Regions:
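Conserved class I S-adenosyl-L-methionine
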Residues: 2-47, 62-66, 88, 164
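C-terminal alpha-helical "lid/dimerization" subdomain adjacent to the S-adenosyl-L-methionine
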Residues: 7-8, 26-30, 63, 147-192, ...
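Local beta-strand N-terminus motif with an aromatic residue
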Residues: 50, 114-115
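Class I SAM-dependent methyltransferase SAM/SAH-binding core
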Residues: 54-56, 60-106
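A conserved beta-strand element that flanks and buttresses the S-adenosyl-L-methionine
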Residues: 118
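Short catalytic micro-motifs in class I SAM-dependent methyltransferases
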Residues: 121-122
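A short glycine-rich, Lys/Arg-flanked "PGG" loop and its adjoining helix->strand segment in the class I
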Residues: 130-142
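C-terminal lobe and adjacent flexible extensions of AdoMet/dcAdoMet transferase-like proteins
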Residues: 210-215
């Protein structure tokens, strides 16, 4: 039986509340593997000037800590569903950074607040991906970018993941929702008003994508 959005968010919250204290540990866990995405996120962000950045699904604030070290004087905001993740992120006292507990599908920020939004290995936990895209479009400034790193695969592999692997993951108590392909992202953009500028499948089934708000 398919899980409801409420159930999936509850499972995700439970998973990451439990993981918060060990998320930054140097163990060979799936969380440690997520760090391999950070250089590509920074490289993409660096292609254009920015002042205000939002990291959606920020976890313990690792991406923001890297950005703040490399680009001091900018303004950084992180949002995550897990209060304990936000607690750990805030305890790092990263300069010019604020961390907020909230739902990425309904971002609690003013319109036109950010030059760019990053989202690393969090998007597959969102039950309503179009709501996330629309919320990002609202808080991005004209011409602003949404940069997503996640998992993807070819059409046959994606069907297998979503039909078999995701339900198995639910049995382990994890709230993964789905993995997506290019056609999915094209639809998300059509329904949210964003423009898909880049969609790549990189090594390790990694999705690297860039969406832009019109000027």
């Amino acid at each position: 039986m398919a899980k409801s959005a409420k159930e999936l968010k509850s499972m995700t919250l439970k998973e990451f509340e439990k993981a918060a204290e060990q998320f930054d540990n140097d163990d060979p866990s799936v969380y440690n593997m997520c760090r391999k995405d950070y250089p590509d996120i920074l490289a993409e962000l660096e292609k254009e000037e920015f002042t205000d950045v939002l990291d959606a699904g920020c976890g313990t604030g690792a991406v923001i800590a890297l950005l703040a070290e490399k680009y001091p004087g900018k303004h950084y905001t992180g949002i995550d569903l897990s209060p304990k993740m936000i607690e750990v992120a805030s305890a790092k006292k990263t300069e010019n950074a604020v961390f907020v507990c909230g739902d990425c599908e309904n971002l609690p920020f003013e319109d036109n607040s950010f030059d760019a939004i990053t989202c690393s290995m969090s998007f597959h936990h969102y039950p309503h991906p179009v709501d996330f895209f629309r919320s990002c479009g609202r808080v991005l400034r004209p011409g602003g970018r949404l940069i997503i790193r996640d998992m993807t695969a070819g059409p046959i592999k994606l069907k297998l993941i979503n039909a078999v692997e995701i339900p198995l993951v639910h049995l382990l108590g994890k709230g993964d929702v789905a993995c997506y392909g290019r056609k999915d992202f094209e639809r998300f953009c059509r329904e949210s008003g964003l423009k898909l500028e880049l969609f790549e499948q990189r090594k390790g089934f990694r999705l690297h994508s860039v969406m832009r708000k019109s000027v």
